[in-house]
Amino acid sequence: LAMAGEPFRMAFPKIIGVELTGRLSNWISAKDIILKMLEILSTKGNVGCMVEYFGEGVETLTVPQRATITNMGAELGVTCSVFPSDDMTRAFLDAQGRGADWVRLEAGPDAEYDRVVKIDLSSLEALAACPSSPDNIKSIAGLEGTKVGQVIIGSCTNSSYRDLMIVAGMLKGRKIADDVTLAIAPGSRQVLEMLARNGALADII
């Protein structure tokens, strides 16, 4: 119907508000935020819902970090995930030469949610999703000593320029163990070209 120009009606989704406070500690990433969400909400029971992130903690997250979180909304089973369009968004678009496209979008002070989840970014610890479900969340500290045979860094969750610069710093001057395979997939050609220009790509490969 929509392709023919007719209205397409759907049920208004339930809205889960996620209030973020504080700031991420060193070595804690946006991936840990969405893994915490999976620990709280699981992968079941969220169909027909959307997630809206708000709160002072949002201002501390870059656009690539927000993209990591919203991309993994699929693992939650939600219809969509949204962040406000704020000054951080404008700075990102300016850097891409698209500043004229920026529009401020944010929830009003009287916004209401069907459920509110609160996450203190300052208290988050490093997390991992273990087999065989994205909501089988474990603390990294509790996985010490686990044998690793394959490492994949990339997809929509670990492939930004910042992510791969951290990887390059960790791998510089080191060698992958003979019984471990490592694959890296930059999130875009732009990221790949930036890594090549600054020499970080050589540290990775």
Where are the model-predicted features located?
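Fe-S-dependent hydro-lyases/dehydratases of central metabolism
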Residues: 1-205
